[in-house]
Regions:
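N-terminal switch/interaction subdomains of large nucleotide-dependent motors and GTPases
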Residues: 1-183
Length: 183
């Protein structure tokens, strides 16, 4: 991990911590469903990126599976994400990690999946789809056994990918999808 270098000189605003990149918004007052929206701060941040190549690592998994802790380890244990309380929405570390002259790496810490309240909505699918379509690498972090983890992941992936197929009107190929690691 010592080869990572944080590149704070790139930005007008000094991002020295994680911030909410994507938040959930109710489309109307009494809705059980939520839409995901990029926050104003997130949009400002993304507009400042000037790398030719950006790699994105998304950490997904069940609630209370230590996704924030794993995100901090990937960043070199700098306590970028608050792992003392459950994350809501999607957070991103405020500095891209330089991986070469024109390549940066971004780390996303997502809200936990499989919450009882989310069983009545499509929120888990939205988190999965967003992670799937934007990431170079998706890490599924879990406290379950790998067998249970793969069963849950496969079920969510099947539902989510069928939603993508409906929207895109075509099957996704392996080049359209991120690498997936189970931790």
């Amino acid at each position: 991990m010592s080869s990572l270098s944080l590149t704070s000189e790139k930005f007008k605003k000094n991002y020295t911590s994680s911030f909410k990149l994507i938040t959930r918004v109710k489309p109307f007052k009494d809705s059980l469903e939520y839409n995901l929206e990029v926050t104003n701060e997130g949009m400002e941040y993304l507009n400042q990126l000037d790398s030719n190549l950006i790699g994105i690592i998304s950490i997904i998994g069940p609630e209370k599976s230590e996704k924030s802790f794993l995100s901090n380890l990937i960043l070199g244990d700098i306590a970028a994400f608050d792992s003392s309380k459950p994350s809501t929405d999607i957070y991103m570390w405020g500095q891209p990690i330089a991986q070469g002259e024109n390549t940066d790496l971004l780390v996303l810490d997502t809200e936990g999946l499989y919450k009882p309240i989310n069983s009545k909505t499509n929120f888990d699918k939205q988190i999965f789809i967003l992670s799937c379509l934007t990431s170079s690498v998706m890490i599924y972090n879990t406290n379950d056994t790998i067998q249970d983890c793969i069963l849950k992941f496969t079920s969510l992936a099947k539902e989510s990918l069928s939603c993508i197929k409906k929207i895109e009107g075509k099957d996704l190929t392996s080049t359209d999808l991120p690498l997936v690691y189970f931790v």
